[in-house]
A protein has these predicted regions:
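Substrate-recognition "cap/lid" segment bordering the active-site pocket of phosphatases
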Residues: 7, 228-250, 260-262, 266-327, ...
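Structural recognition of alpha->loop->beta junctions
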Residues: 84-85, 281-297, 363-387
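Active-site neighborhood of HAD-like aspartate-dependent phosphohydrolases
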Residues: 3-75, 91-94
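Conserved phosphoryl-transfer catalytic core
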Residues: 51-190
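Acidic, Mg2+-coordinating phosphoryl-transfer loop and its flanking beta/alpha structural elements
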Residues: 274, 328-376
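Conserved Rossmann-like nucleotide-cofactor binding loop
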Residues: 39, 46, 269, 334, ...
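Alpha-helix termini
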Residues: 23, 59-64, 103-105, 252-254, ...
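Substrate-recognition element of Asp-dependent hydrolases with the DxDx(T/V) motif
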Residues: 51, 131-137, 141-199, 207, ...
Length: 395
């Protein structure tokens, strides 16, 4: 698709693009569903830092060697998300940690295998990490030189290029394939995967460390009912800011003629509500789908339903009742893929990609254009103006 096939509009925040062959359907929109992170809320100083800090913390404890918090850069995080399989930031931490440990010298992996077996799997995640940290103190000091770190970053970027929209599963499959000639690696991989246990807060190393650093002590205890053990101060969530302006949500409600605004997000409900505050009341309560809702459905249906699976989008749309057409607004390739899959099931879905609050704005704009997204906006705040330009009027 060439740029000539788009209607281009200029706004203060940047350029907007509308596919000309979608305009008639956009005019019929009577429901709008939003992703949360990067769309309603600016997360650039929260989630991305939580990923790099969590990975560095876990790796330091599990190897006995300090890892710089800035080693896993915004570029690396962007590459993970660009695969379409890492909307869940816990999965990004998993990918970083598993790959890094797979690159460790064989002697370190051998020690680590023994330490994990000694630590077992019954104690709390932080207790298990500290046990392994203490195990390293019993042996010769572990050393990793600057060359290891520089090669690690390069090799990690190359590894991410072979990952796909299956996310964590593609991490496991590709690591096992890369090390298929190593007789000990499969046992190491299985043991490590069980040790990290990437799902449940209070049992999972990754989830527990991440949420403590992200939420901070007070919010972590309030949400999960677990006493914090590694972060006794404020969390990175305090760095978040609202992108969406209340007046623009009001404009959309007026244009639609009813409160047909929903959320389909991989965020945790309580952390999203913490930042959205009273704005959450502007959304249809029947059309709010967060990570906990998807996880509950996965347990019930016994199959993976996280993005880019269209479950959360279609579930949120159900809350609107009968609609002619809906717009889903996201900021990642995973969102675009999810909307495309939802459109395969129902032709009513239009995708709008927003790029202003992504890590690399120009790169995300280029990707959205290459993917032939229906609408491309700098931010969600331009949408009311676009709908009005196309003939929609406030009620």
């Amino acid at each position: 698709m060439t740029l000539k096939e788009y209607l281009k509009l200029n706004f203060e925040n940047g350029e907007a693009y509308i596919r000309r062959d979608r305009i008639s359907q956009i005019k019929e929109v009577d429901g709008i569903i939003f992703d949360c992170d990067g769309v309603l809320i600016d997360i650039r100083e929260s989630y991305n830092k939580a990923i790099s800090k969590s990975a560095a913390y876990i790796l330091e404890k599990i190897t006995g060697f300090p890892f710089p918090e800035d080693l896993f850069s915004n570029e690396i995080i962007h590459l993970f998300r660009a695969t379409g399989g890492f909307n869940d930031d816990w999965d990004t931490v998993y990918g970083i940690v598993m790959f890094t440990l797979s690159k460790m010298p064989s002697e370190i992996r051998k020690h680590l295998t023994t330490f994990i077996e000694e630590a077992g799997f019954k104690n709390s995640p932080i207790s298990r990490l500290r046990f392994i940290e203490n195990c390293w103190k019993r042996i010769e000091a572990n050393t990793l030189d600057a060359r290891f770190f520089s090669e690690l970053v390069k090799d990690l970027k190359d590894f991410i290029k072979i990952l796909d929209s299956t996310g964590r599963r593609s991490v496991d499959e590709n690591l096992l394939k890369i090390h298929e000639q190593d007789a000990d690696f499969q046992h190491f991989h299985t043991l490590l995967k069980r040790f990290l246990n990437s799902k449940e807060i209070g049992r999972s190393v990754i989830a527990t460390v991440f949420e403590e650093l992200f939420c901070g002590a007070r919010l972590f205890k309030e949400i999960y009912g677990i006493n914090p053990r590694i972060n006794m101060g404020p969390g990175l969530i305090e760095n978040e800011r609202l992108i969406v302006k209340p007046k623009h949500l009001d404009s959309l409600i007026s244009i639609l003629g009813r409160k047909n605004l929903g959320i389909a997000s991989g965020s945790r409900r309580r952390s999203a509500e913490y930042i959205l505050g009273e704005l959450i009341k502007k959304f249809n309560p029947k059309s709010l789908v967060f990570a906990e809702d998807v996880e509950a459905a996965e347990r019930l249906l016994k199959k993976p339903l996280k993005k880019p699976h269209p479950y959360s989008l279609l579930k949120a749309a159900e809350g609107f009742g009968k609609v002619r057409s809906i717009i889903y607004i996201g900021d990642s390739m995973e969102d675009a893929i999810m909307a495309s899959r939802a459109r395969d099931e129902t032709r009513r879905v239009i995708f709008a990609g927003v790029y202003r609050y992504t890590i690399f704005e120009e790169e995300m704009l280029r990707i959205f254009l290459k993917y032939r997204c229906d609408i491309i906006l700098p931010t969600v705040n331009e949408l009311p103006s676009i709908l009005e330009m196309l003939g929609r009027r406030k009620n």
